[in-house]
Amino acid sequence: MENKTKEQNALGQDTAQPVVDGKKVLLRLKDVKQYFPVKKTKLREKQRYVRANDGISLDIFEGETLGLVGESGCGKSTLGRTILQLYPQSHGDILYYKDGKGIDLKKLSYEEMRVIRKDLQLIFQDPYSSLNPRMTVGQIIGEGLTSHGVFRRGDPAMKEYIFKVMEDCGLANYMFNRYPHQFSGGQRQRIGIARSLALNPKFVVCDEAGS
């Protein structure tokens, strides 16, 4: 059974955080569709679309791990990026519940979404192209910490914090000043994982992070 206060916003959406069987909903997807237009080859050709995601509705609960299984190209990565608003959905609602109230992610401004990104992180599938080759491990992990105001640049406490995150992700402290090209693919993936977890996010999309 679902229990929730019927607190409605101007759009008629429930803004109070839903609780289902005693579990708090963190993210709620309602009929989410993600269509990409196909380039026309003829002047009067009817617009066609690739339906990457077509009518997805689900709840993701606090503390829950949800796995999406499917063949290559079925839309798993697209759904993850759509939730994070890297691709705003073509249709439907994605609500993120913070401090007990729902936030419609698609309606946020760029700056508002930038604040929320601290809570919603992505571990990229490709550990090679997702790391800046000109930045050291410490700089890569610390970039989000400074841009989101967790630490000031040059703060000695930030280095100690990064060391702790690196240790948690299986990276030795002596790797702090090394560059991505000095690591194997698996080690690079650990760097990407550390970068995301350093912000202590509420939700993480792991795009085949173990591959």
Residue ranges and their predicted role:
Residues 179-183, 187:
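Conserved ABC ATPase signature
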Residues 193:
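Hydrophobic anchor residue at the start of the ABC signature
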Residues 27, 51-53:
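Conserved structural motif at the start of ABC-family nucleotide-binding domains
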Residues 93-115, 154:
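ABC ATPase NBD Q-loop/coupling interface
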Residues 200:
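Conserved catalytic motifs of ABC-family nucleotide-binding domains
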Residues 69-70:
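The feature captures the beta-strand-to-loop junction immediately N-terminal to the Walker
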Residues 100, 156-174:
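Conserved ABC ATPase "signature" region
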